[in-house]
Amino acid sequence: MGKILIVDDSSTVRDEVAGFLVKNGMEVLTAVDGRDGLDKLKHDADIRLVVCDVNMPNMDGLTMAEKLRSELGNTQVNIIMLTTESNPSMKERGKAAGVKGWIVKPFKGDSVVETFRKLSA
């Protein structure tokens, strides 16, 4: 199983999600915004899943997803948005960028693990 990258500008959310995933035996990296996340994706081919917020400074999560697909040409990494946003137009933009799941905060850690397991099956 590959690594999971958590991209969120909130250290509380990053720590909570990462802690839950590590307890479930998964290897986790973190990034503070979309720009940092994209940089980590450029340099680590073992990342298989990105769990990402939408609203972040420097680069938002949807822009990061679009750049991952268009600029890096990476279609192998699965992307799940973990966000307070539930706007249908944002979800459509995410779908167009290859986002595979949309989890609305507050979340249950089990939902992230379950979604990852479905995507890796």
Predicted features by range, described:
Residues 15-23:
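Charged docking surfaces used in two-component/phosphorelay signaling
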Residues 107-116:
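C-terminal output helix
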Residues 53, 83:
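Active-site residues of response regulator receiver
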Residues 25-32, 40, 103:
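Short hydrophobic/Thr-rich beta-strand motif most characteristic of the beta2 strand and flanking loop
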Residues 45-51:
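Active-site beta3 strand of CheY-like receiver
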Residues 100:
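Short, glycine/charged-rich "phosphate-handling" switch motifs in NTP-dependent
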Residues 56:
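Receiver (REC) domain active-site loop signature in two-component systems and cognate sites
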